[in-house]
Amino acid sequence: MARILQTLYGLPSRSAQELADAINSYQTNVEDYPDEEFGLLSCRLAYQAVQLGNFGIGCVLVDSSGDIVGQGFNELFNPYFRSDRHGEMVVMDTFEENNKSITSMADYTLYTSLESCPMCLARLITSGVGTVKYVSPDLTGGMVHLMTNLPKIWQILAARQKFPQASVPSLLVQLAFDIFKLNADELNSKIVNR
């Protein structure tokens, strides 16, 4: 099992330094790509996660006015191991803890640098976030592209929401996936060996 996980995602096409340079020099064009600003921020957060030894996934929660009301990144290994600290979970935990009187999330949008895994997708469906946009698909670990495989009740609950890929250029899609690939195989092996 550990051998399979060591090559599941493969190496990123760029080094960590090249990815940092790409993030820092990236210029947005929101006229052509309306999700690019928040998509880029989710990638910057994902890179922070990698620098701390976590999976490279970052998330931004935005209200109906386009204001950022939450942001965070994967914290699975650092500051200490917590199996529930996926990027989406971190953002939703903090938001829900600090906004207990909000009864509807229908007008909110969550941006994530990588397509949500099964656990995060179930959480986002339960939360009722109106729209969840991912920068990069994850055909190996993502669940959005497999929503028809969810149990029927989850499909019914998810029908009130949208889960599209973010409107961003392919350059940002590749950047998001390369950030994730920086340490994904290594960290998956750590999980297998727990």
Spans of features found by a protein language model:
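Short beta->alpha transition motifs characteristic of CBS
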Residues: D67-L76
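A structural motif shared across PLP-dependent enzymes of the aminotransferase-like
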Residues: D63, R85-M89, V168
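Glycine/small-residue-rich phosphate/adenosyl-binding loop
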Residues: G70-Q71, G87-S104
